């Protein structure tokens, strides 16, 4: 296992997944402020760090009352959001997992 080289708490809104033209149309021709903020974060932080894994804790995934840690070596499929299906419908995803890291995180589980 390596070390933590960075951490961030980032805001997000489901509309970020809409096409740019749709976002502009919904926001009187202006981009939502989150988009340039995330681009700046990528340039100033993500592109400057030496990392190999990103851990995302998000309240909009399969559960809102607990965190689920999956130890799959790879996950892929099509995602449709329950909150904003018109913006996130059948979005393909394929990403590598890190079973070793997932199991290390799971060791800190609080038993209910």
Pin down the residues of each PLM region.
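A short aromatic-anchored loop/beta-hairpin motif
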Residues: 2-111
């Amino acid at each position: 296992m390596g070390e933590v080289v960075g951490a961030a708490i980032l805001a997000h809104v489901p509309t970020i997944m809409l096409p740019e033209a749709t976002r502009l149309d919904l926001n009187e021709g202006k981009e939502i402020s989150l988009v340039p903020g995330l681009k700046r974060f990528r340039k100033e932080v993500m592109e400057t760090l030496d990392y190999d894994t990103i851990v995302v804790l998000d309240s909009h995934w399969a559960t809102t009352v607990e965190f689920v840690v999956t130890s799959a070596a790879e996950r892929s499929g099509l995602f449709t959001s329950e909150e904003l299906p018109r913006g996130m419908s059948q979005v393909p995803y394929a990403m590598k997992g890190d079973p070793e890291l997932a199991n290390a995180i799971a060791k800190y589980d609080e038993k209910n």
